[in-house]
Structure formats: C-alpha cells, structure tokens
Amino acid sequence: VITLRLSSSQRQFLLQATQRYAARIEIATDYLASRQLSVEEASIFHLGVVDEPLPGHEPYKGRLAIPYITPSGVVDIRFRGMNGEDPKYMGLVGAKTTMFNTQACFVADKYICVTEGEFDCIMMTVKTNHPTVGIPGANNWKPHYVKILDDFDVVIVLADGDAAGLEFGKKISRELGSVNIISMPDGEDVNSMMIKQGSEWLDERIRECVTPG
C-alpha cells in the first residue's frame, strides 16, 4: 500500500490532533445516531469532534474529524460538517487526498469493496463483514490505486445513486480488470440504504458478485 511521506513532526501533530478530537466524540452522539452509528463504532475509526482546535485547525471547529490511519500512523484528517455546513467536507491545507481504511487491503482475500466517501466505508466495516476502502469523493480517484486493488480477483464498487456515482464506478472499471458495480437507487448511498433496508440488502448483492455461477 502506498503511503504519504510526512515528516515525524507532521505525523506527531496529526496523532495529537486525532487523540484530542477523539476524546470529544460524545459531542457528535446525536449526529452519529442519525446515521445509525454508535459512539463505540465511531471510536473504532478514532472519529472525533474539533471542540478545542489545535493551532491551524480553527476553521474546522465544530466539525467531525475523520483521521486517515495506516499501519505507519495517521497520515491525514478530513473534517465533515454536522449541521449542513458548506462545504460539507474540508481537508487540511496542502494535503493530498488518499485512500481511506487501507488496513482492509491487508485482511481482504479474493474481493474488496470500494465506496465513494469515508462514512460509507465506515458503515460497511462496522455493519458488515465485507473488507472495504473509501475514496474521498468521485473526483479523487488516482491512477496508483490500481496497483493497490489489482491483486484482488473482484473489486466491487458501491456507487452512489447519482450521475457522479455512476461515473465513479465507470472510471474504476476502465482502469481495473474485474470490477462489479453495485449502484444505489436514485438519491441514495450506502449509509442511507443501510438505514432503510439494513445491511442484508447489500450482503445479498455482494454475494451475487463473489459467488461463482
């Protein structure tokens, strides 16, 4: 798995931020509940709330902190608004987007799922047994991700039910060999479908992609 090159001081700062914000995750209890995610489940991914920002993080105050954690440590943090803020997501100044939940690549066997966004990836990981990575937005697919995913027999793209989601799936299928696209209904994403239909809805469709015949 390709990781970002950060200095030791940058890594230490990201770790400090992750720990500080994760300690205040209870502030997001109601927001998480609206997404059918518990505080305990959110803590698996060290999600947090920017209640007391570290220097330089003042623009993210009040947002949900989503750290990108790899075997080598925290490599990035993205910040999601919880009250309809615009933009919905904010990234660190100068940071390059990367793949979310790369640990799944080490535990996956024959197939792996790909979501558009961190939250859908989190939901797949805590609510199902399907190894899943996330790409932070349909426009953030990068060519070197092919090297990461090419080892798997089947790559299952869980595409949002909109034009961007469809293009996201098509883009990955053009670059990888064995890709199955599971499109969500119009206007839906993985999280909303889990809320409406339960994880069984996705389990059934994923099984169809990985079961021969």
Regions found by a protein language model. Name each.
Residues 1-65, 69-71, 106-107, 207-213:
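TOPRIM metal-binding catalytic domain and adjacent DNA-binding surface shared by DnaG-type primases
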Residues 51-153, 168-169:
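Phosphate-handling DNA/RNA-contact segment within nucleic-acid enzymes
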Residues 114, 152-164, 183:
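Acidic beta-strand-to-loop metal/phosphate-binding motif
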Residues 131-132, 155, 178-181:
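Hydrophobic anchor at the start of a short beta-strand
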Residues 135-141, 160-163, 184-187:
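Short, acidic/turn-prone active-site loops that include or flank metal/cofactor-
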Residues 147, 157, 174:
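Conserved catalytic core of nucleotide polymerization and phosphodiester-bond processing enzymes
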Residues 184, 195-213:
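Metal-dependent DNA phosphodiester-chemistry modules and their immediately adjacent helices/loops
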